[in-house]
A protein has these predicted regions:
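Catalytic phosphate-donor-binding core of small-molecule kinases
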Residues: 1-11, 52-130, 139-242
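N-terminal glycine-/serine-/threonine-rich phosphate-binding loop
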Residues: 1-42, 76, 121
Length: 242
């Protein structure tokens, strides 16, 4: 079937994948998401090593199906799901991708202050941060925030209550705990990021501002005064064999 390379998870950020590589992950859902982020569209076959312990929503195959899955993928006969990624790009040229979600806000349990620009409108805000979710991640952190908002409002339904499709050309941003004051507003706290409507954030924090993806707080970009970050759909997409 060709050559193979065994790779430890910690080596992912620096490994150079070839354009025709097929990547096999053996582990839990988090490994799948983390692997997709470091690829350029190469197909991923996700194996559940212990179906008795793990549900594996992102793990469609078991160990015994590996050879068949790889053979079909090589032959171009496998079904595949496309996954839209989020991209954060700063005005000094730094970039970070997200498979599930991005967080922009304070490093610790303090308030973030920034200027938010979206869809032709702008507003200075103070909040505990902004979550930007992909369809892939819309049943995770985003779902939790939405459930809390619905509970407070007394509403039982919302069109995004069950998330949205992995392949949709959109992201969804949510402002956490926005604080209204004489100088900060709360009118732009929820919206869709599309190709036509990116989200721009300009930091007004002297220190402790961060941008990180997929819950990995140790791998972050600084978001302090002078930093402007644009959140948009990434050109790169993930490909998960199903």
């Amino acid at each position: 079937m060709g050559r193979f390379q065994l790779l430890e998870r910690r080596l992912l950020p620096n490994y150079q994948f070839g354009p025709t590589d097929i990547v096999v992950t053996i582990g839990q859902d988090g490994l799948v998401a983390n692997t997709l982020k470091y690829l350029e569209g190469q197909p991923v076959i996700a194996i559940n090593p212990d179906p008795g312990r793990w549900d594996g929503k992102l793990l469609p195959f078991e160990i015994g199906e590996l050879q068949s899955a790889v053979t079909k993928t090589i032959a171009g006969k496998s079904a595949c799901k496309t996954i839209t990624f989020a991209e954060a790009k700063t005005n000094d040229g730094q970039r970070i991708l997200a498979v599930n979600d991005l967080f922009v806000g304070p490093k610790s349990h303090t308030s973030a202050r920034y200027l938010l620009s979206w869809n032709g409108r702008e507003e200075t805000q103070s909040s505990s941060g902004i979550i930007i979710s992909t369809g892939f991640g819309s049943t995770g952190w985003f779902q939790s925030i939405l459930a809390g908002a619905l509970g407070v409002s007394g509403s039982e339904s919302h069109p995004l209550k069950k998330g949205f499709a992995w392949h949709e050309q959109r992201l969804q941003f949510t402002v956490r705990e926005p604080f209204p004051s004489l100088t900060t507003g709360t009118s732009l706290v929820f919206g869709a990021i599309t190709l036509a409507t990116p989200l721009k954030l300009e930091s007004q924090m002297p220190e402790n501002g961060v941008i990180f993806s997929d819950g990995i707080e140790t791998d972050y970009l600084a978001f302090n005064s002078g930093t402007v970050v644009t959140i948009s759909l990434a050109a790169t997409q993930g490909q998960l064999i199903v």
